[in-house]
Amino acid sequence: MPAGLVVLVGPPASGKTSFVRALIARRQIDAEAVVSSDEIRAELFGTSPAEAESEEADARIFDERDRRIVARLATGRSAIAESTNVTPQARARLIAIARRFNAPVTMLRFNPAVTDLVQQYTERRRTDLTAEDVRAYATIMIRDAGADQLRSEGATTVHDVPGRRQATTPAEAAAQFSFV
């Protein structure tokens, strides 16, 4: 993939973080290239769910995410935006940042079967979302994040990342991609 902005697109528990960890473990990317909204949330708010789950908190988290992405793109380095990014509004914000630096936008889609998604979510034992929330994200993904839609929004390239549905581990999926 060319240098620029890589946007991960997928519901919670779809394999985005596992994929990124596999890329790092395989030394395909530097950990510093990954800008994770979950990690920023933890940095800013620790384990205080009451503080971290508000519109004000989300604004702080995504402003910080954007700041980190800008810092990387401004110096010609790639950035990987690791958050759900299933809505056009979320992606528009990222595409606008990339355009400021004439950086290509590669979108990687994580689109597991809903049954696999709910199973993966259950295995994670997270309490910040419900299974119904995860299903809702999947519905939005199906409606608003098809490959043609992503291209029409400004993605230079769109790739589907294989996962459980294709009997592919995160490491096997990571091996199918290369980053410049």
Predicted regions span which residues?
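Conserved helix-turn-beta segment of the N-terminal RecA-like "Helicase ATP-binding" lobe
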Residues: 97-98, 126
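Conserved nucleotide-binding/hydrolysis micro-motifs of P-loop NTPases
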Residues: 39-41, 86, 111-116, 165-166
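Conserved substrate/cofactor phosphate-moiety recognition/catalytic segment
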Residues: 17-77, 116-119, 123
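Aromatic/hydrophobic pocket-lining residues that form π-stacking "cages" and hydrophobic walls in ligand
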Residues: 68, 94-96
